Every structure is written in C-alpha cells, then in structure tokens.
A protein has these predicted regions:
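Extracytoplasmic small-molecule ligand-binding "clamshell" domains
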Residues: 30-103
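Periplasmic-binding protein-like
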Residues: 43-44, 122-130, 200, 208-247, ...
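Bilobed "Venus flytrap"/periplasmic-binding protein-like clamshell domains
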Residues: 45-47, 58-72, 127-181, 200-202
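Extended ligand-binding regions for polar small-molecule ligands
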Residues: 21, 63-64, 68-73, 135, ...
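C-terminal motif of bacterial Sec signal peptides marking the signal peptidase cleavage site
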Residues: 15-19
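Ligand-binding clefts/hinges and TM-proximal coupling segments of bilobed small-molecule sensing domains
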Residues: 22-25, 76-79, 156-176, 215-217, ...
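Acidic, polar ligand-binding/catalytic clefts
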Residues: 79-143, 215
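A ligand-binding cleft/hinge motif common to bilobed small-molecule-binding domains
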Residues: 87, 102-112, 160-163, 187-223
Length: 270
C-alpha cells in the first residue's frame, strides 16, 4: 500500500496548522464547588464539531453536546482540552483526559484501548469527496483507481480505506496528515489529492465556509455513528451517568436541536 505524508513543501499555499498537537482548557460549566472535574478531549480547529470561537471559547456540535450533558450531571464539572485528532486519542490513552468527544466512530483498534459510550449522538455516513471542477465525482472506492486520497491520521476514514487497500493493494494512494478544514479543502481543490472522505454535512460546511463546490458520491462508502469515548480507567458510574444523560437529551429533542444548529439538519441516530 502506498503511504504518503504531505509536507509543507508539497502544499506551499496552505496555512501552517496552528495549535495542532497543543492543548488548551476551558470549563464547560461552573458546577458545584465539590463537583468532580472531568477533562474532556476535543478539537480546537474542527468545524463544525469542536473549535475555538472568536472569543477563544470552545464551541461546535460535539462541544455543545458535552455541555448539555454537563448541565444534567451536577456531581461533575467538565473541562475541555483541545488538540488535533490523533493527539486527543493519545491524551485519552494516557489519561490526560478521561473522556473524548471528537466524532469517534467504532473500530476494533479503539475498542481494545478505550471504552465507548452506549449512545450514538451523530450519524457518520462517509462519502468520497472531490472537486468536480478539477476532476471527477467518485461513487465508490473502485472509482479511485490510481488516485490520491487524503485521510486524517488515526481516523476511521483512514482505517476503512486501509481495509480496502489490504484486499486491493495499490488500488489508490493514501495521503496522511493532520490538516485543518482549510488545508483539506485546498488539498482537494488544488489537485494535490484527488479526493478525501467525509460525511455530507462536513462537505456542506466546507463549501459554505470556503465558497467551494465540492461534491460527494451518490452513495456512502461506509455507514456508522459517532460515540463518546472514555479512558479504560474512567469510573464506570460516571460513564453510566453520561450514557443516561445523553439518552435523555436525545429523547427530549435537545440533541436534535443542536444537530440542526451546528450541522444544518437532523443527523441524530435512532
């Protein structure tokens, strides 16, 4: 399997990825003075899921979901620790954070290292994304023969593409990185890569944010949901409380409202 890491010289027009790998903290709510602090790993440049707003405060769909859970759990107070996607997983594994909210889908490698929450909070159906002005719209992995495909390191999108390539060696070339949204879009529109993998609402966000016309294939190449993720040493009573709170927030329509606010549609799993 071909494996490429794009460096700065390859994409000279891209911005330097600020804050990548670094962390910053923000408290979800004040909570009771004797409440147990839970550090929550998330993103700081991952619109529309987790990012720092113009005031330096954490915002986004995943952040809002966690804040809603925190409001229901009076015995706990949540503090956000921002980083890129793979660093957040490393922070969770080392117990620097006890919980992570970063659109984590289920895969076997993570199941060995972490504990997944029981309640899915967003549909994550993955499509092949491309720029029709620069090439072709791709409906399936078979259509990507001989192409370059960007995936973020340690994501489920990387894992699913790797699984396909394990059975179809050299079908296409994977390009790995930890790009922010702007860098991913520029990689696709500049022709540095031919395609990437993402859900439909992420592509809508890219097009709206950067005035682009990226398109998705006619069908998803993978269907799944995203879940909260916990360190294996995290207290089970806390995990159970989070699961219960999230189920209640789905039942009362709160999660649907947040999905419509941040994702421009109802992407809440059944």
């Amino acid at each position: 399997m071909k494996r490429t890491i794009l460096g700065a010289s390859t994409l000279v027009t891209l911005l330097v990825l600020g804050a990548c790998g670094s962390s910053s903290a923000d408290t979800a709510s004040s909570g009771a003075s004797d409440a147990t602090e839970i550090k929550v790993g998330t993103g700081n440049e991952a619109l529309p899921y987790a990012y720092l707003d113009e005031n330096g405060e954490y915002d986004g769909y995943d952040v809002a979901v966690v804040k809603a859970i925190d409001e229901k759990l009076l015995d706990y107070t949540f503090t956000f620790e921002g980083a890129d996607f793979p660093t957040t997983l490393s922070n969770l594994e080392s117990n620097k954070v006890q919980m992570a909210a970063y659109e984590y889908e289920v895969n076997d490698e993570r199941k060995e290292k972490f504990v997944y929450g029981d309640v899915g909070y967003v549909v994550w159906d993955t499509y092949i994304v491309s720029d029709p002005d620069a090439g072709t719209v791709y409906d399936s992995f078979e259509d990507l023969a001989g192409k370059k495909v960007y995936v973020t390191t340690a994501t489920n999108q990387a894992a699913m593409a790797e699984a396909y390539l394990a059975e179809n060696p050299d079908a296409f070339e994977l390009v790995y990185g930890e790009y922010n949204n702007e860098q991913i879009v520029q990689a696709v529109t500049s022709g540095a890569v031919d395609a990437t993998l993402a859900p439909e609402y992420q592509v809508d966000n890219w097009n709206n944010s950067f005035s682009e016309n990226l398109e998705i294939g006619s069908e998803p190449v993978h269907n799944s949901n995203a879940y909260l993720l916990f360190n294996k040493e995290t207290d089970q009573d806390f995990i159970d409380a989070v699961n219960t709170a999230l189920e209640e927030l789905k039942a009362d329509g709160t999660i649907k409202e947040l999905s419509e606010k941040y994702l421009d549609g109802d992407y809440v799993p059944e």
